[in-house]
Swiss-Prot record:
<dbReference type="InterPro" id="IPR002381">
    <property type="entry name" value="RNase_PH_bac-type"/>
</dbReference>
<feature type="binding site">
    <location>
        <position position="89"/>
    </location>
    <ligand>
        <name>phosphate</name>
    </ligand>
</feature>
<dbReference type="Pfam" id="PF01138">
    <property type="entry name" value="RNase_PH"/>
</dbReference>
<dbReference type="GO" id="GO:0000049">
    <property type="term" value="F:tRNA binding"/>
</dbReference>
<dbReference type="GO" id="GO:0009022">
    <property type="term" value="F:tRNA nucleotidyltransferase activity"/>
</dbReference>
<keyword id="KW-0819">tRNA processing</keyword>
<dbReference type="GO" id="GO:0016075">
    <property type="term" value="P:rRNA catabolic process"/>
</dbReference>
<comment type="subunit">
    <text>Homohexameric ring arranged as a trimer of dimers.</text>
</comment>
<dbReference type="Pfam" id="PF03725">
    <property type="entry name" value="RNase_PH_C"/>
</dbReference>
<keyword id="KW-0820">tRNA-binding</keyword>
<comment type="function">
    <text>Phosphorolytic 3'-5' exoribonuclease that plays an important role in tRNA 3'-end maturation. Removes nucleotide residues following the 3'-CCA terminus of tRNAs; can also add nucleotides to the ends of RNA molecules by using nucleoside diphosphates as substrates, but this may not be physiologically important. Probably plays a role in initiation of 16S rRNA degradation (leading to ribosome degradation) during starvation.</text>
</comment>
<keyword id="KW-0698">rRNA processing</keyword>
<dbReference type="GO" id="GO:0000175">
    <property type="term" value="F:3'-5'-RNA exonuclease activity"/>
</dbReference>
<keyword id="KW-0548">Nucleotidyltransferase</keyword>
<dbReference type="InterPro" id="IPR027408">
    <property type="entry name" value="PNPase/RNase_PH_dom_sf"/>
</dbReference>
<dbReference type="InterPro" id="IPR020568">
    <property type="entry name" value="Ribosomal_Su5_D2-typ_SF"/>
</dbReference>
<dbReference type="GO" id="GO:0006364">
    <property type="term" value="P:rRNA processing"/>
</dbReference>
């Protein structure tokens, strides 16, 4: 994108963010997260049976699944179920979501049960994995809060909040929260998952058009940290009315 200049918002600004809690009635926790034109439904379902590899260990598990509706993109995507297998991208993203959430949960306090996270992209315009992580935390917190209020858990096993955002270099300019045109035409980009205390869970970085320096990486991380701070406040606001 040699002539691209972002004009719709500042280089260090998020897209318009909206998180609607309790978006679906038939699950323990849910929300719709909207990051600009990217929209993801996130749900959390409690299963009172821990996975087999944890039986008898007095600890729980959090896992995630991720998918995109066929019409979530400009050209219809074939359902992965009809292809008979998940793509490598899908498997990578759902593992990332699961890892990100497990990093902020005390599994012993969760007890011998698992929480199943589902992230379904209904409209995609870049940043679906980061939006999924940010929304999934809200759904998880709602589900866990229900376990506590119902007396099933004596204390909340969630240690702190977690959120994620992208940043990238487009036409030599570091930008926060890339939309699809920016993401597809960037020089380099990163996806960063960070806790409320500022600890990094994961950094995924790739040079798409040109390698980037450690100094540029530092600028992208700083941009992401700013954006994640704002996303954490959106999460708090959504949970305060949940």
């Amino acid at each position: 994108m040699p002539d691209y200049i972002r004009t719709s918002r500042a280089a260090d600004s998020l897209r318009d963010i909206k998180i609607t809690p309790h978006f679906l009635p038939h699950t323990d926790g849910s929300c719709l997260i909207e990051c600009g034109n990217t929209k993801v439904i996130c749900t959390a379902s409690v299963d009172e049976n821990a996975p087999p590899f944890l039986h008898g260990k007095n600890q729980g598990w959090v896992t995630a699944e991720y998918g995109m509706l066929p019409a979530s993109t400009a050209l219809r995507m074939r359902r992965e179920a009809s292809a008979g297998k998940q793509s490598g991208r899908t498997q990578e993203i759902q593992r990332l979501i699961g890892r990100s959430l497990r990093a902020v949960v005390d599994m012993e306090k969760l007890g011998e049960r698992q929480i199943l996270i589902d992230c379904d992209v209904i409209q995609a315009d870049g940043g679906t994995r980061t939006a999924s992580i940010t929304g999934a935390f809200v759904a998880l917190q709602i589900a866990v809060g229900k376990l506590v209020s119902d007396g099933i858990l004596s204390e909340n096993p969630i240690l702190e909040a977690v959120a994620a955002v992208s940043a990238g270099v487009v036409n030599g300019v570091p930008l926060l929260d890339l939309d699809y045109p920016e993401d597809s035409g960037c020089d380099s980009d990163v996806n960063i998952v960070m806790t409320a205390s500022g600890k990094i869970i994961e950094i995924q970085g790739t040079a798409e058009g040109a390698p980037f320096s450690l100094d540029e990486l530092g600028k992208l991380v700083a941009l992401a940290q700013k954006g994640i701070g704002e996303l954490l406040r959106y999460q708090q606001n959504a949970l305060s009315v949940a």
